[in-house]
Amino acid sequence: MARWLSQFFIKAMGVAVASAFAMSVSVAQEAKELRVGLLATLSGPAAIFGEHMRDGFMLAVAQSNGALGGLATNVLVVDDKLDPEHAVKQVTKLIDENGVDVLVGVNFSRVMLAVHDPVVRSKTLFIGTNSGPAPIAGGKCNRYFFSTASQDDQVHETMGRYASLKGYQQVVTIAPDYEAARDAVSAFRRHFKGQIARELFPRLGQTDFAEEFNQIAEIEPDAIYAFMPGGMGVELVKQFHTSGLKGIVPFLSSNTINAITLPITSEMGEGLFSASHWAPNLDNPANKRFVREFSRKYKYAPSVYAAQGYDAAKLIHFALELTGGVKEQEALISAISAAPFESVRGDFRFNSNQFPIQDFYLVEGVRRTSRLYEMEAIARVFDDVGDAYAGSCRM
């Protein structure tokens, strides 16, 4: 009996030691590296948006000493060239050849709509850091996709609500003549209770807005709402400044006045309004550290695109600290769902469609010094709000 017990304990100890060794090998192998694919627009006129997003993400990686969640982190940065077909080829390579554990990024909706399905079909965890098209927030939502940005309509809805809160009755809208811009105007109308005096849709690429401003002057609206991204927006702001309307007709906008265009428009963008879920003056410790260290490292002021990239890396970091690795994907998805991190925007949690529930602000272009202009949050317009499409999401 004693001999049998002795042999039993020897065998049990052997199994325990072997199991412990196997577990330690498994953990060691898993902990070796985290592979992240970062897809951004990094060439052409829109490259600055991707650069901000990339730099924000990489700052958070640097703050973790190159090891998100304690895992040595290899970030594979890929330029989507704002080309949906090229982007699909790149994400396929990142998944099939590079074996990335997580994909992050995407600046523009037409790229996001192209890459979303192949990524989630592969069951690769995907964290969007800017684009949030309605289908992905609604009927095509997927448990493998999260967003640290917002749903695309929300900034336009914020300006519509603000216009109503101000009591504006007559608003002229101006946006380029393409589908996404018309969608932006529709989103503005969703929360604006007054009347649209006129919708102006200049052709895409137009740079002379004299006729549009003549029409606005004749109508004498309570406000202008502009959705005019990129170079068109810069020209619109410059010509608004010289039109004689500045200081008379309030200029409300989305994706027109921001941290990227304001250094170009400088005093011409001062005093003009936009909407955002983030601004450099949001008063919380995480944001103060982000703004300070981003400016110090990159020698330029961060934008919302940088903030969204930064939050994505922080989200991954703290989720991995909970799970200890990426091997158990279900555990990692659950950890990310809990949003266990301090966002630069303050209050942050995920909705049922895995897009954020967050605050939205009226932001204004302000002058800090003779050469420094930045966006400043001056009023909260929405408090802890989700998007209009979450109810259509079925996971």
Predicted regions and their residues:
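Short, low-complexity disordered leader/linker segments with a strong preference
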Residues: 1-35, 394-395
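Extracytoplasmic "Venus flytrap"
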Residues: 33, 37-56, 78-85, 107, ...
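Beta-alpha junction/loop-to-helix N-cap segments that form part of ligand/metal-binding clefts
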Residues: 33, 48-53, 63-136, 148, ...
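Extracellular/periplasmic Venus flytrap/periplasmic-binding protein
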Residues: 89, 134-135, 142-242, 280-289
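Periplasmic-binding protein-like
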Residues: 94, 98-107, 127-129, 172-175, ...
